[in-house]
């Protein structure tokens, strides 16, 4: 999107719905998070290649503590990193071998699918499974 954020307000609104669900108050309004995110983008604009884009990530944790009950204050962060589109170029030219992994996402009985979270262990497990499958042919 040539340096312009795409639907960031909707992304932040979803994040805040998830925070409400898990009972974490980030100490910032949705609008403040949006302003901070846009400022981080502006501050790092010199890192974005011409015609490139950023991966933008906002995160909120319950903060330091041995348990969620003892934690606080919350830790809030916003990161941006240039997206390396060149790593995908060969996929367009040559195609890519795909594997449907047996590893699944979290059960909706364990975690409400509406919750925006950064637990990606199931993705890592699926990547390992796909790599083994590719090695085995």
Predicted regions and their residues:
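Conserved alpha/beta cores of soluble small-molecule-handling proteins
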Residues: 1-136
């Amino acid at each position: 999107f040539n340096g312009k954020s795409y639907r960031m307000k909707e992304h932040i609104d979803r994040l805040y719905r998830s925070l409400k669900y898990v009972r974490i108050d980030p100490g910032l309004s949705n609008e403040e998070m949006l302003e901070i995110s846009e400022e981080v983008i502006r501050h790092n604009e010199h890192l974005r290649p011409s015609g490139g884009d950023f991966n933008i990530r906002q995160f909120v944790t319950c903060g330091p503590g041995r348990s969620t009950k003892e934690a606080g204050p919350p830790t809030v962060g916003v990161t941006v990193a240039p997206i390396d589109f060149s790593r995908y170029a060969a996929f367009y030219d040559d195609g890519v071998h795909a594997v449907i992994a047996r590893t699944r996402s979290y059960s909706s009985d364990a975690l409400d699918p509406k919750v925006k979270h950064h637990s990606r262990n199931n993705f890592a497990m699926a990547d390992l499974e796909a790599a083994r499958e590719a090695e085995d042919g």
